[in-house]
Amino acid sequence: MLSPKRTRFRKQHRGRMKGIAFRGNRICFGRYALQALEPAWITSRQIEAGRRAMTRNARRGGKIWVRIFPDKPVTLRPTETRMGSGKGSPEYWVAVVKPGRILYEMGGVAENIARKAISIAASKMPIRTQFIISG
């Protein structure tokens, strides 16, 4: 599972996901990519599940790049706890994804294999996505 080695602060505000992604919205490494169409928090488990699905489907050929990283801690309070007494402890990590952001890239395989592998990874994501080709 992906997570930062160390952070400056243990807890973060939730924040807002306004607008579209201006960074990380172009294909940089591979030839095929999976692009987000909706804003969402994507957990490190979902990122890992998508990556595993792609590698399993592409077999030995091809290379995969994960273009998002979960750097935001999400805190949860213990169940059946009364309100107050501070913020909960960090439970898991999420990547903040805006529309237009590239999630995964793939190269070194035929288009039909890439399309199939990326569609399986897309089914693991909690948002609508699209398959795009560079050039």
From Swiss-Prot:
Name the CDD domains for this protein.
Answer: Ribosomal_L16_L10e (cd01433)
UniProt keywords (A-Z) are:
Chloroplast, Plastid, Ribonucleoprotein, Ribosomal protein
Q: Which InterPro entries does this entry report, sorted A to Z?
A: Ribosomal_uL16, Ribosomal_uL16_bact-type, Ribosomal_uL16_CS, Ribosomal_uL16_dom, Ribosomal_uL16_sf
- Which GO BP terms sit in this record? translation
Spell out the molecular function terms from Gene Ontology: rRNA binding; structural constituent of ribosome
Which is one Gene Ontology cellular component term of this protein? chloroplast
Where is the protein situated, by its record's location annotation? Plastid, Chloroplast
Q: Which family does it belong to?
A: Belongs to the universal ribosomal protein uL16 family.
Which HAMAP family did the record assign? Ribosomal_uL16
Matching NCBIfam families, A to Z?
Answer: rplP_bact
How it assembles, according to the record, is: Part of the 50S ribosomal subunit.
Query: What is this protein's name?
Result: Large ribosomal subunit protein uL16c
Source species: Manihot esculenta (Cassava)
- Encoding gene per record: rpl16
